[in-house]
């Protein structure tokens, strides 16, 4: 992780609805506990230009965290909308939430929230760092709203189109 690597984003047209269906299906196969995901308030089809592999990993990582940090019966709501040339995706869970003092750091490399009130969750603290890095490379933004004991909502905003070219990334 300390070495710099060259990446290339390969933009292509991505059907967000189909991608989300695939992510939910894959999570249901790999998850050790049952969960419910609602894909509501979404247009029939949202198309955006993105690197399909990285977008899959971004959304899968956030959904995986929502499941891990939501106790025995996770309920996750995913919504998406098109607005002013952007796509806004919200992933909301009914999990343990994130305390205010941690919100500014959860996207930092290797940052882990310590909480003695819950059993430890496996991880290295790089998932959300990767998520934020890749979203920024797509010229997008991510933010989180959270209340301890009530859950979290991750809000991703991505441009709907990009110039048709490969973009070099050094990270």
Which role does the model predict for each range below?
Residues 4-9, 45-50:
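Conserved micro-motifs of the catalytic ATP-binding
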Residues 10-25:
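A conserved beta-strand-to-alpha-helix junction within the catalytic ATP-binding
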Residues 66-67:
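Short helix-loop "hinge" at the ATP-lid/N-box region of the Bergerat-fold HATPase_c
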Residues 73-85:
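Short beta-strand/loop element within the Bergerat-fold HATPase_c
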Residues 98-110:
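Short conserved segment of the HATPase_c
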Residues 30-39:
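Short conserved segments within the C-terminal catalytic ATPase subdomain
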């Amino acid at each position: 992780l300390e070495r710099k690597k060259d990446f290339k984003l390969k933009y292509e047209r991505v059907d967000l609805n189909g991608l989300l269906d695939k992510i939910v299906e894959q999570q249901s196969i790999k998850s050790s506990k049952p969960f419910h995901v609602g894909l509501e308030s979404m247009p029939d089809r949202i198309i955006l230009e993105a690197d399909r592999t990285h977008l899959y990993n971004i959304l899968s990582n956030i959904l995986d965290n929502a499941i891990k940090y939501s106790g025995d019966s996770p309920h996750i709501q995913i919504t998406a909308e098109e607005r002013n040339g952007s796509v806004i995706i919200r992933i909301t869970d009914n999990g343990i939430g994130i305390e205010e003092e941690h919100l500014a750091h959860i996207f930092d490399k290797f940052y882990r929230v310590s909480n003695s009130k819950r059993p430890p969750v496996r991880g290295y603290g790089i998932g959300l760092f990767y998520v934020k890095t890749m979203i920024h490379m797509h010229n997008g933004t991510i933010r989180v709203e959270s209340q301890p004991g009530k859950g979290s909502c991750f809000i991703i905003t991505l441009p709907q189109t990009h110039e048709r070219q490969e973009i070099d990334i050094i990270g």
